[in-house]
Amino acid sequence: MSAIPQADPLSASKLSSLQRSVKVLVSALAVFLLTGGDRVSAKSPDLNETQLHARLADPASGLRDFVSLIEKSMITGEMSPVEELVDQQLILDRATDGIQIAGASTMKDLFSDSTRQSWQQTGITRDFAGTNFRFLRVRTFKNRAGLLFRCAGENHALNFFSFTLSEVGPRDYRITDIYTMGLNEYTSETLRRSYLHLAANLLGEEGRALTKDHGAFADSLDKVAAVSQLLKAGQWSEVLDACAALPPAVQNDRSVMLIRLQAAENYSVTSRAEVLEDWLKAYPDEMDLPLKLADHYLTQERWDDAERVVTTLLERTGGDARLQLQLGNINYRRDRDKLLMQTAAARN
């Protein structure tokens, strides 16, 4: 663990509390560190679109080989080659830099160490293992260019991920962040949210002022951790009940709503629909959860809403065969419903 800076003193009791809170927070939210912001000050070494296109077109650059390695690792489930290419420190720096409060340096060290330990146990790219993971094209999200991949898993699960890259030497690249289209968020943004909650819990009013809920989540940290444990145990009904008992501001926290959604998806169709409608009230931008909402609209036969979301996804990805197929299915089912209604009307 990194040495505790003398210029950033904390009492022994507060340090002990900090260590415990870091472990609780990272454990509670580890499931969303990928899938998982605020503007930060870390300098980005990302290659831009022009640079990425140029290297893809140049066989000597090695970028095509890099893409092939990623695809092979994901499909076979042999994740270690890709894990070694992730610049963990850069992601953590992007998530934690820019907070100038007494105690922040120590908090950053402990948060970073705990997060690395979590990654060592589970891996940053673990959710991709064994999926059909295919490179599509260079694409920019939130002003950061990257390599866009389509991820198709079991039960027709579909998502898209963009890997931002740095070039550390000839034919040598590192993954500097991962954008998840299904959540409209980079890994560093997910971590940033968790880090700010930790600041609110430990750094007094200055820390609380950094969060949108002014520390409400931090005040419920132990309860959120308990909910997370219920989720890991597969106690879906208990998770939903526990979330409903949280303060309103905490219920609407993005991470808590994702925990609630995961439980609802395993509990009942009705519960899932309720959570997604609550999500839309808290986060009206459909592109913050586009793939889940597209499926939600399809289930409810809200064809126009489903078409709107899928069409926007097609625009953002630059086109995709599976999304195009989904759009065709929407149009077919809508036309079928119209025909059935016309036939019924004619009979009457």
Q: What name fits each language-model region?
A:
Residues 255-260, 288-295, 322-326:
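Alpha-solenoid helical repeat scaffolds
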